Curated annotation (Swiss-Prot):
Its EC number is 1.2.1.8. This is Betaine aldehyde dehydrogenase. NAD(+) binds at residues 150-152, 176-179, 229-232, 253, 285, 386. Its cofactor is K(+). It comes from Burkholderia vietnamiensis (strain G4 / LMG 22486). Pathway: Amine and polyamine biosynthesis; betaine biosynthesis via choline pathway; betaine from betaine aldehyde: step 1/1. One of its GO terms (biological process) is glycine betaine biosynthetic process from choline. One of its GO terms (molecular function) is betaine-aldehyde dehydrogenase (NAD+) activity. The modification Cysteine sulfenic acid (-SOH) is found at residue 285. Binds 2 potassium ions per subunit. The active site is at 162 (charge relay system), 251 (proton acceptor), 285 (nucleophile), 463 (charge relay system). The record marks 247 as: Seems to be a necessary countercharge to the potassium cations. K(+) 2 binds at residues 245, 456, 459. The gene is betB. It catalyses: betaine aldehyde + NAD(+) + H2O = glycine betaine + NADH + 2 H(+).
Length: 489
């Protein structure tokens, strides 16, 4: 028996059975307990979801922007009312501590929907005068049916981030959550339906990458929004272009630099470094895993980091006191342990952690100790490649120019941060760093108002902020002639 039983697809405002006859299992990463059997969508199911979305989108787009805004605000209220219930499911599915999911995942997802509900009525065109008797006006119109493909680290938050601007602009969305954490997207679908979103406007199809490929290549989908790894992102972009030249926005991986200058408040810098590496057990795309510390303060900074690592409370995610849980899956655990072994083999100095935790109840879960390496070099695998786990690499530097060059020496460009009391140096450095999301004397917050996305191979386009509405609308230009028409022939 599983905890949540059989999970079906959500199409046309209701749960429906998949036609594939296939299911997959999802497990609690803290205990290994079977959470649910989940039905896998077939190609026919994807077609059914897209057709339902087309029908629902026409009804949704015909509403006024104010009507759509009111419905989305009702969804926000329902999300907040069900916060504790949804957080409990998210904790079981992802392994995140309950204190984290209660305070962050649903809360921030609801905030983004509320933000775009407020902007729905502000989507407008321009009027461009040409001459006394002629002008042009533009309309921002919805794209139609969009596809959202989510990652496993923030399941419901990502679903909210993708649906909020899409629905606010009058689109429909077919969403595929990660097969590793598939549960809460279905709850969001229930909430949208209860709030009054027309049937078909938000459909959920479950499955592995083959289902994502069906969505990406579907000729009746106008846009794909993807969150995940770089290599998968490249496949998404290629298939989207080859199928129908559909628009793509992607938030991909990172190997982000955190730069600590010698005038930094060391307590603040250590606090930032620890949260930038160990929040959500290090499974955050924007993690600042390359910690560059000016040489004169490296020892003092490292000591403060290690003090804080000792205070991390690793435990059962369902315990209120826990602030560090397991990794999301056995596969992710093996990957992280492989990186740790690589760091040791390449000569990095292990300062903390570096092992799987197996004592007591830890033996049933995918736990790895918070890990800190010192004496790291830029050419090490743990410094070059995204780990997506709780592994911090500390590197030292001498000069501002040196650290900027080294920080930019990567094909990633998602995030970056600077800790310094010198405001001029902070801005000067940030302006030279090749990253789309940057923080000065803080780390990690991504409010609804803030556009987020990467440079280089860390992504295309943005999520959140006003600019994201541009990715979910298309411009129609209309010329109006009020005067006499002058024929050419």
């Amino acid at each position: 028996m599983s905890v949540y039983g059989l999970q079906r697809l959500y199409i046309g405002g209701a749960y429906v059975d998949a036609t594939s006859g296939k299911t997959f299992d999802t497990f609690d990463p803290a205990t290994g307990e079977l959470l649910a059997q989940v039905q896998q969508a077939s190609a026919a199911d994807v077609d059914r979801a897209v057709a339902s979305a087309q029908q629902g989108q026409r009804e949704w787009a015909a509403l006024t922007a104010m009507q759509r805004s009111r419905i989305l605000r009702r969804a926000v209220d329902l999300l907040r009312e069900r916060n504790d219930e949804l957080a409990a499911i998210e904790t079981r599915d992802t392994g995140k501590p309950i204190g984290e999911t209660l305070a962050v995942d649903i809360v921030t997802g609801a905030d983004v929907i509320e933000y775009y509900a407020g902007l729905a009525t502000a989507i407008e065109g321009l009027q461009v005068p040409l001459r006394a008797e002629s002008f042009v006006y533009t309309r921002r119109e919805p794209l139609g049916v969009c596809a959202g493909i989510g990652a496993w680290n923030y399941p419901i938050q990502i679903a909210c981030w993708k649906t909020a601007p899409a629905l606010a602009a009058g689109n429909a969305m077919v969403f595929k959550p990660s097969e590793v954490t598939p549960l809460t997207a279905l709850k969001l679908a229930e909430i949208y339906t209860e709030a009054g979103v027309p049937a078909g406007v938000f459909n959920v199809v479950q499955g592995d990458g083959s289902v994502g490929a069906l969505l990406t290549g579907h000729p009746d989908i106008a846009k794909v929004s993807f969150t995940g790894g770089v290599e998968t992102g490249k496949k998404v972009m290629s298939l989207a272009g080859a199928s129908s030249l559909k628009e793509v926005t992607m938030e991909l991986g990172g190997k982000s630099p955190l730069i600590v200058f010698d005038d930094a408040d060391l307590d603040r810098a250590a606090d930032i470094a620890v949260i930038a590496n160990f929040f959500s057990s290090g499974q955050v795309c924007t993690n600042g895993t390359r910690v560059f510390v000016q040489r004169s303060i490296k020892d003092a900074f490292t000591a403060k980091v290690l003090e804080r690592v000792k205070r991390i409370r690793v435990g059962k995610p369902t315990d209120a006191d826990t602030n560090f849980g397991p990794l999301v899956s056995a596969a992710q655990l093996d990957k992280v342990l492989g990186f740790i072994a690589s760091g040791k083999a390449e000569g990095a100095k292990l300062l903390a952690g570096g092992t799987r935790l197996t004592d007591g109840h830890f033996a049933d879960g995918q736990y790895v100790a918070p890990t800190v390496f010192g004496d790291c070099r830029d050419d090490m695998k743990i410094v070059r490649e995204e780990i997506f786990g709780p592994v911090m690499s500390i590197l030292d530097f001498e000069s501002e120019d040196e650290v900027i060059a080294r920080a930019n020496d990567t094909h990633y460009g998602l995030a970056a941060g600077v800790v310094t009391e010198n405001l001029s140096r902070a801005h000067r450095t940030i302006h030279r760093l090749e990253a789309g999301i940057c923080w000065i004397n803080t780390w990690g917050e991504s409010p609804a108002e803030m556009p987020v996305g990467g440079y280089k191979q860390s992504g295309v386009g943005r999520e959140n902020g006003i600019t994201t509405l541009e990715h979910y609308t298309r411009i129609k230009s209309v010329q109006v002639e009020l005067g006499r028409y002058n024929p050419v022939f």
